[in-house]
A protein has these predicted regions:
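Structural preference for beta-strand elements that scaffold enzyme active sites
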Residues: 34-36, 59-63, 83-85, 119-121, ...
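A short, N-terminal amphipathic alpha-helix
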Residues: 20-31, 114
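Canonical radical SAM enzyme core domain
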Residues: 7-22, 42-83, 87-107, 124-137
């Protein structure tokens, strides 16, 4: 996140909960049945728990930093979503404060201690010369919290961002040090490549969009808070779904528009520089 923050939107510029619900309904009819709510921090939005609790049954998960003081953890536990993904890039207070710009590690740890969900994942973006020395700490930390840790290569979109740290070398070191098994596997067509721990029952995941891209297996599309549709996080093209939703009352017309746009999703690398940062895209 840039120190100055990101561009702020007027309330009218972002999708309402009713519009999001409409998108979920229409995309289900197109065969899309797995949804993840991310950010930024989705739990900051006023009324979001009421929205989550009113959703029809389905395969939902949330990505959150769990960094909000006074966060209603009991309400999170009652959601019974398919998974809860937690973002945390350092377990050291000073580094945590730096990477979050203002976060307090003790708040995160206090919130995490109260989480009671069946499928808990901790996502760690590995940043060169920043948190590479915390890999084993995160593996141990995840085990203590009955979670699966997933290491993610930093996606370097904009000029001036820190270089990513290749997970290929990190995996090699973990295998050589007897921490993970060399054989890899995938779970439910996930883009994550998992290795089981040699000691213990857990798994360690690796998401490698740079060194070993998975474009041919990716079925994700992203809908930003302002209603822009991204078919690929690396691509520069955005499609304005918000205006279609607000100008077209017929769900079938919106469904056809979505169907036609989704056909343009790339299944090979289209990495471009000087695009939006992940802080702007979300996720």
């Amino acid at each position: 996140m840039p120190e100055e923050g990101v561009e702020k939107f007027y309330h009218r510029d972002i999708l309402s909960f009713e519009e999001i619900s409409r998108v979920l309904r229409i995309t289900r009819e197109l065969g899309i049945n797995k949804f993840r709510f991310t950010g930024g921090e989705p739990l900051l939005r006023k009324g979001v728990f009421d929205f989550f609790e009113a959703l029809p049954s389905g395969d939902y998960n949330i990505t959150t930093a769990l960094a909000i003081e006074g966060l209603d953890i009991d309400r999170i536990n009652r959601l019974k979503f398919a998974a809860l993904n937690i973002s945390c890039d350092s377990l050291k207070p000073d580094k945590y404060r730096y990477i979050t710009r203002c976060g307090d590690l003790s708040v995160f740890l206090s919130n995490l201690k109260r989480v009671r969900v069946d499928n808990l994942k901790i996502n760690v973006v590995v940043i060169k010369d920043f948190n590479e020395d915390e890999i084993v700490d995160f593996i141990d930390f995840a085990g203590e919290h009955r979670a699966t840790v997933r290491f993610i290569e930093k996606m370097d979109f904009a000029a001036g961002e820190p270089e990513f740290s290749s997970l290929t070398e990190i995996k090699k070191q973990l295998v050589e040090n007897g921490i993970i098994n060399p054989e890899s596997f995938r779970i439910n067509n996930s883009v994550s490549e998992y290795h089981s721990l040699i000691k213990g029952d857990g798994n360690v995941g690796f998401i490698t969009p740079i060194t070993r891209h998975f474009c041919q297996d990716c079925s994700k599309i992203r809908l930003k808070a302002n209603g822009e549709l991204k078919l690929c996080v690396f691509a520069g093209d955005n499609y304005n779904l918000r205006d279609i939703l607000r100008s077209e009352p017929d769900d079938d017309v919106v469904k056809k528009w979505l169907h036609d746009i989704i056909q343009f999703k790339p299944f090979e690398p289209v990495i471009k520089k000087n695009l939006e940062t992940m802080a702007e895209i979300g996720g």
